[in-house]
């Protein structure tokens, strides 16, 4: 403190007065009084002759700052007003107030222990500068000019703060009770953390409940954690003073808060002689750590910005498998033990080799998970499983930006701590800067969770956002919806399907919270458009707004919906928000009336809100015009209440009107998030179509059984060369896969449907897998044929090609089917409603239709190559024969390859672009008869198969009547050494 020009001291002087006449006794300084009034009003009244009473006089002393202690030891001269009275004896001297004045004329007046400024004066004058921690205390006040009061003697404490136990377990409920002996007012609660002495105000939020009744008040914290540990303060006013009661609360460190890197380790002593173990805890906790065993090892402490790590450097491999233990201890708290198991890799153990992709992976024993730290400024761990076969599995990255985690934690603590009106805008400002650095699904999830938490806080506290804060929110939303992080959305939604719905609800809530003074307000970006305005008496009738989006969108609210609000004299604010691409991130959930039909959305969501005097209104008629929309349309809104809180599309209260040929009009009777569903080519339930599919599939099953019987009779005869072997092997596996798939399809209607039925789930999985396998075997046949056509003289190894075909035919579809099951079953989107088959929405599209159509495309390309080869002129034949053979070859290729390669699935494309029933009939009939096509064109039109079948049926056993197999290569016959002539291309089609 700077040098002081003058020091003042206020004393409480206690005097016994004998035989006094009843009178008022003034203080030494008449300008000083407890409440800033005249001190002459203070008295002790003499109650009778011969009695003795005590009179307290407050004496104002002034002296130099360096000599005042010595002045106190001198004899006091009583003021003149007291000197005329009979002799007095000084029985007590108490220091009440010490004031130090600086050169600017400001006096800092501090109360001595046992005294305090009264509550009225305490609220009138500021706390002493530089003593922020005491700003809610009445121990020191700053006066600019004359000091207008003095500290008073405190009465007994009028309340008690009760806590069941200082030690609170994680997740438990904390209950603090303030028992009041006197009437208390202006009660407030604060929390001081052990590492931060700044008090944090507590308010009634999601995690905090404040109660009050006669004689007591309470504070309840619903879910305790280390972020709620510290010293709780209760500040209130009673008996004219401000009181502060404190209670210390501790929360033990939890096991999940201890980060062990690694938590388990397999090590090869030949590749590495030593290793390092880390045991990290939050910096805010007061713990010490010890490692055991610790012999011949060096332990150290490393402190980061928000954590501290106890590191053990082990220079040598232990002789056997060892468990190292990190024991964490804190005063008056139970110890916490964090074990780390070390496994020594022995000779002969299966291991994964060193790998330096992404991060450095050391030699790891099969079945163990290797761990690596996250990059700088990220929290979490990078994991990678070493499979039992010694092959590294994909990297699992759970790293999250430390700054994003900090913002999310601050938003979480706003459920009862801090000042939302200050911290919500700050978090929004910081968050929009972090979107650009998001690189993992956990980054995206934490950002969306932060916005959701902020929305809850804003709704609970009725916090109003400034235009700047709302702009930060909309900028963040625009970046989150950008296509650059679309891959993060897919991965994150696999773990949290409702995150898109929660984000939509949060943005709706925050947009509603714009201050009325900020209207009108507008914002425009690539993915977010917002327009808001105030309606007054002078506003034109109704409300209308247009957006330059695709499809073009206009929204209006008729005057009859707004008139009651405007005529009441309140300022009505209307906000229209368009979010593009967010509808793609919402779950594919549809309420009753919209089931069993795959839909698409135009890529935008319209959110309309009406607010009057801070109150949101949900009922109003909204008319929306969408331009250039085709197909069957449904006007819908996103209902957050359905599907166990995940939300879903509903058409309740909305109806569609065709305004004209190019405009579709939606009219809804409520305010929420609107969109339009496009089911461009929906075919209604058709019993005839279903019957034809069942009959065709049954015929296909019978045909496939006949085909298997034929192969059982003639197999050894027809596969005597490589080309024939490859062709008939693919056909045989196609028959097996299609037979199993069709059988499951026919039996599925007789099974109990739903996710509770295991047999239903198994049937759906088998249908998916074997139908896919059928087409992958078709692809294998096409690729083998393409090789024979393009590389005539290249020899193929039977074992290599067979292995490749098996991998392509079974492992690839198994991967598709397994991933689909893992992604969509937890979301309950795997099954078609009421059926034991794949969901007809996005599941069918992405996991079945797209792979099938891709295979059909490749097979179509092979067909084109075959046709071009057939049209190539032959040098050995004349023009007439050449033309005839070319035409015959084309017809044969079209008739055989089209059904065999599944090109009839190309009709599926027609069902996407043609809404007529004809394309659906053609598609269903042709594909249900796939097994019949394989029997006819794969077996019965093959002259070699027919010849072998006839001979087998006639009982011919002669080995000399071997069927001549014509291939695209020269070969030596099993019974003849003569060269055969090269086969024509059309013959290769049938081989």
Curated annotation (Swiss-Prot):
GO biological process, one term: cell surface receptor signaling pathway
Domain GAIN-B: 519-684
Ranges of compositional bias, category Basic and acidic residues: 972-991
Principal localisation: membrane
UniProt keyword Transmembrane, yes or no: yes
Carbohydrate attachment residues: 75, 102, 118, 321, 362, 484, 571, 589, 630, 660
Tissue specificity statement from the Swiss-Prot or TrEMBL entry: Expression is restricted to testis and circumvallate papillae.
Location of the region described as Disordered in the Swiss-Prot/TrEMBL record: 964-991
InterPro entries: Adhesion_GPCR (IPR051587), GAIN_B (IPR057244), GAIN_dom_sf (IPR046338), GPCR_2-like_7TM (IPR017981), GPCR_2_extracell_dom_sf (IPR036445), GPCR_2_extracellular_dom (IPR001879), GPCR_2_secretin-like (IPR000832), GPCR_2_secretin-like_CS (IPR017983)
Transmembrane parts of this sequence: 695-715, 731-751, 758-778, 800-820, 851-871, 893-913, 917-937
Signal peptide: 1-20
CC per GO annotation: membrane
Compartments, record wording: Membrane
A Pfam family per the record: 7tm_2
Keyword Disulfide bond listed: yes
UniProt-listed SMART domains: GPS
Site residues, Cleavage: 671-672
Entry membrane topology: Multi-pass membrane protein
Binding partners and assembly: Heterodimer of 2 chains generated by proteolytic processing; the large extracellular N-terminal fragment and the membrane-bound C-terminal fragment predominantly remain associated and non-covalently linked.
Family note: Belongs to the G-protein coupled receptor 2 family. Adhesion G-protein coupled receptor (ADGR) subfamily.
Function as written in the Swiss-Prot or TrEMBL entry: Orphan receptor.
Name of this chain's protein: Adhesion G-protein coupled receptor F3
Organism ancestry: Eukaryota, Metazoa, Chordata, Craniata, Vertebrata
